[in-house]
């Protein structure tokens, strides 16, 4: 009989219950116990959904109050020593301070989890880091599931991936792999505690196997799993996000009891594991996208596998379902307005049922689920033949693009002269990244407008009032290049998707980005174009309120692609270029309307990189081409900005330079300007604005901290090409800390300008 198991589930709840409870707790509106009760209820619901899909093992240990890698830092005693906290007795309040910072310490750095848009908290490893086991997080969840009468499989990120996703810190140079001998015994203690609590199987996830690992890291797997094999539980080694075929010989030799492989991202790797003689878990339902599977097609893969493997075949999603929205069935508007599209989709709960159908088809025969298989086939056929998806005019515009269509008219050296001639900016020009606080009033007005309780004219008036406030406050602070604050935007991607053709939206399709921050990605289901101007009216209104330059604000094509659920019937590169041409129409309209500083945000450029370096060039070529297409045809005097965050840039700087933005602003404060060093070494040719304070925390930095970062930046970047700005947009902050933070930034800027003028 084929076994069905799960690797992980969304944590926030069907209606973001965890988010709202967390934020109430942070505002001291509910007690810790009330927050714990919400979390326990969500875990139980998740397990019951998995059980309802006839799962043989539900996933435990995947639920977290903030981030599963932060949980692992606590479990291994690897929390940053700079906080002075005891990982053995860590109150929830201190757990959140690790993630969000406090008055004495900045938050743990955050970056993307492999090539997803989920963020994890980066472990800080020092040469003298000591580890200490605390298995409470995993054991408690295991026991909770057992109390419900469920068979549960704890899921823990493995030791090599844990070290791989961390960073070396401190003044002593060392390789974090050298910490492995100290870390391994702690893992043994954690796994032993789980065995003692009744775990039969434990899933140890090693997604690092899907990247280009150095030889010494690959070789370390032998000793690691020889050691972990001494624990009496059965180990399922989990891999996902890409192919691990190159490590097939190693993986077949490891003393584990089973292997999970991602057959959605890398179906071709199955051949490499044809002779595997242990449990093989086939990840056949997409854990990262929202398209319904053609179950008959999936059975063409897993049917023959079952014939070969028998009871050694397990099935699951490709990876944790963390990356998918919770439940399609609550999307009543989508069902009413786009019934065909609705029939092509599957969210987390629907994916659990797809797995239930597959298990039944394998174990009881296809006739037992004939109706479900027929419905799956009908949806696949409908999507393949839909006239809603393909547009001849969009295809023709792409086909007719000349070579080098995105090239600016002149090189940067000439453009910057034309720009400074009218901008007349001081040394160390200051700006904001884009958004200002999304207040309760803004959200209430938007909600009332969407419900039809507020007229279009009243909504516009409310947003204009907010824009006027943002402009006024920036002028008071004496910022140089202003932003309008994006009051009218619910989300930097969703806003544009709602105004572009080929996109669709959900009401409750939220996925976790980090902590309590959730995003609701648009669905790109068809060819993309821009029916009418999207931002021009708001930007020109803001520009008319001030004599200072006002930035037009657009989200770039790669980021819109990366932060959407993308159609999987044509290449992603084609979709991206379609978006770029739609944005180009907007850029040229902004320019005509007198907006001569235009920011095209690309925070997601790096997360689109394939996990294997051999595939990078192809991606970077079409990503860079798409960015250039979006600003094609601009005058030299129009200044194009871009913004990138949470990124390691060192290895893609030539590609970033080839994007040829006049100004790039980057997130650097959490890494103490570490990321900026690469730009200096590369001699990045255009203007740079490194973030001088962290906006992800409500903490107001001291002037000394901001000055320290800005002086470090001046050491790296020629001062005439250096801008001063926060790390990122200010949407999630409150007004009080926003103004205090910006005031600190401006005070330091004025001090250094005066010093440099001497």
Curated annotation (Swiss-Prot):
Binds 1 zinc ion per subunit. The gene is metE. It comes from the Bacteria. Pfam families: Meth_synt_1, Meth_synt_2. GO terms for molecular function: 5-methyltetrahydropteroyltriglutamate-homocysteine S-methyltransferase activity; zinc ion binding. It catalyses: 5-methyltetrahydropteroyltri-L-glutamate + L-homocysteine = tetrahydropteroyltri-L-glutamate + L-methionine. InterPro entries: Cbl-indep_Met_Synth_N, Cobalamin-indep_Met_synthase, Met_Synth_C/arc, UROD/MetE-like_sf. Keywords: Amino-acid biosynthesis, Metal-binding, Methionine biosynthesis, Methyltransferase, Repeat, Transferase, Zinc. PANTHER family: 5-METHYLTETRAHYDROPTEROYLTRIGLUTAMATE--HOMOCYSTEINE METHYLTRANSFERASE. It comes from Neisseria gonorrhoeae (strain ATCC 700825 / FA 1090). L-homocysteine binds at residues 433-435, 486, 601. The keyword Endoplasmic reticulum does not apply. 5-methyltetrahydropteroyltri-L-glutamate binds at residues 16-19, 112, 517-518, 563, 607. HAMAP family: Meth_synth. Belongs to the vitamin-B12 independent methionine synthase family. This is 5-methyltetrahydropteroyltriglutamate--homocysteine methyltransferase. Pathway: Amino-acid biosynthesis; L-methionine biosynthesis via de novo pathway; L-methionine from L-homocysteine (MetE route): step 1/1. Gene3D superfamilies: 3.20.20.210. Zn(2+) binds at residues 643, 645, 667, 728. Catalyzes the transfer of a methyl group from 5-methyltetrahydrofolate to homocysteine resulting in methionine formation. Its cofactor is Zn(2+). L-methionine binds at residues 433-435, 486, 601. The active site is at 696 (proton donor). GO terms for biological process: methionine biosynthetic process; methylation.
């Amino acid at each position: 009989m084929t076994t069905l198991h799960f690797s992980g589930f969304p944590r926030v709840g069907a209606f973001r219950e965890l988010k709202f409870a967390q934020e109430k707790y942070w505002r001291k509106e509910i007690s810790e116990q009330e927050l714990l009760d919400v979390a326990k209820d969500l875990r139980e619901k998740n397990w019951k959904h998995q059980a309802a899909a006839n799962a043989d093992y539900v996933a435990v240990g995947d639920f977290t109050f903030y981030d599963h890698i932060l949980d692992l830092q606590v479990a291994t005693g690897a929390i940053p020593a700079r906080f002075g906290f005891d990982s053995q007795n860590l109150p929830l309040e201190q757990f959140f301070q690790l993630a969000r910072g406090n008055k004495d310490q900045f938050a743990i750095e955050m970056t993307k989890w492999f090539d997803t848009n989920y963020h994890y908290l980066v472990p800080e490893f020092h040469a003298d880091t000591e580890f200490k086991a605390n298995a409470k997080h995993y054991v408690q969840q295991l026991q909770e599931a057992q109390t419900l009468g469920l068979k549960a499989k704890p899921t823990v990120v493995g030791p090599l991936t844990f070290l791989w996703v961390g960073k070396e810190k401190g003044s002593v140079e060392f390789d974090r792999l050298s910490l492995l001998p100290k870390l391994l015994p702690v893992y043994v203690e954690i796994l032993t505690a789980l065995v003692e609590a009744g775990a039969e199987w434990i899933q140890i996830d090693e997604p690092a196997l899907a990247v280009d690992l150095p030889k010494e890291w690959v070789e370390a797997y032998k000793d690691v799993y020889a050691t972990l094999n001494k624990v009496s539980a059965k180990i399922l080694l989990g891999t996902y996000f890409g192919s691990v075929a190159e490590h097939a010989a190693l993986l077949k030799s490891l003393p584990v009891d089973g292997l999970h492989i991602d057959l959605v991202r890398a179906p071709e790797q199955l051949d490499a594991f044809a002779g595997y003689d242990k449990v093989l878990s086939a990840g056949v339902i997409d854990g990262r996208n929202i398209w319904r599977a053609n179950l008959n097609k999936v059975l063409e893969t897993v049917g023959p596998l079952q014939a070969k493997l028998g009871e050694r075949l397990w099935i699951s999603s490709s990876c944790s379902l963390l990356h998918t929205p919770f439940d399609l069935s609550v999307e009543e508007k989508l069902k009413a307005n786009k019934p065909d599209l609705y029939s092509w989709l599957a969210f987390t709960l629907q994916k659990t049922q797809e797995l239930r159908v597959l298990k039944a088809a394998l174990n009881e025969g296809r006739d037992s689920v004939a109706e479900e298989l027929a419905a799956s086939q009908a949806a696949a056929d409908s999507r393949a033949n839909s006239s809603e998806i393909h547009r001849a005019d969009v295809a023709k515009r792409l086909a007719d693009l000349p070579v080098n269509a995105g090239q600016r008219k002149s090189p940067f050296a000439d453009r910057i002269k034309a720009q400074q001639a009218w901008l007349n900016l001081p040394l160390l020009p200051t700006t904001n990244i884009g958004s200002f606080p999304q207040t309760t009033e803004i959200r209430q007005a938007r909600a009332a407008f969407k419900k039809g309780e507020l007229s279009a004219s009243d909504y516009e008036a409310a947003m204009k009032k907010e824009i006027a406030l943002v402009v006024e406050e920036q002028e008071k602070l004496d910022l140089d290049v202003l932003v309008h604050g994006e009051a009218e935007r619910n989300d930097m991607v969703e806003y544009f998707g709602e105004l572009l053709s080929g996109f669709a939206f959900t009401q409750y399709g939220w996925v976790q980005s980090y902590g309590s921050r959730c995003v609701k990605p648009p669905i790109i289901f068809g060819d993309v174009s821009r029916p009418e101007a999207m931002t021009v009216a708001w930007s020109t209104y803001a520009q008319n309120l001030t004599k200072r330059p006002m930035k037009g604000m657009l989200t770039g094509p790669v980021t819109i692609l990366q932060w959407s659920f993308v159609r999987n019937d044509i290449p992603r590169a084609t979709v991206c270029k379609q978006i770029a041409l739609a944005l180009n129409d907007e850029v040229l309209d902004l320019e005509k309307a007198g907006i001569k500083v235009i920011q095209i945000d690309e925070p997601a450029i790096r997360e689109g990189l394939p996990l294997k370096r051999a595939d990078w060039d192809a991606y970077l070529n079409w990503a860079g081409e798409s960015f250039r297409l979006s600003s094609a045809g601009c005058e030299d005097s129009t200044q194009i900005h871009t913004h990138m965050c949470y990124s390691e840039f060192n290895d893609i700087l030539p590609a970033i330079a080839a994007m040829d933005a006049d100004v790039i602003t980057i997130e650097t404060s959490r890494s103490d300007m570490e990321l900026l060093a690469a730009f200096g070494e590369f001699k990045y040719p255009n203007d740079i604005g490194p973030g001088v304070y962290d906006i992800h925390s409500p903490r107001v930095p001291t002037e000394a901290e901001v000055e320290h970062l800005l002086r470090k930046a001046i050491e790296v970047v020629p001062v005439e090409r250096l801008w001063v700005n926060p790390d990122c947009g200010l949407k999630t902050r409150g007004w009080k800390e926003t103004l205090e933070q910006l005031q600190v930034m401006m005070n330091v800027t004025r001090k250094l300008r005066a010093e440099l003028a001497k």
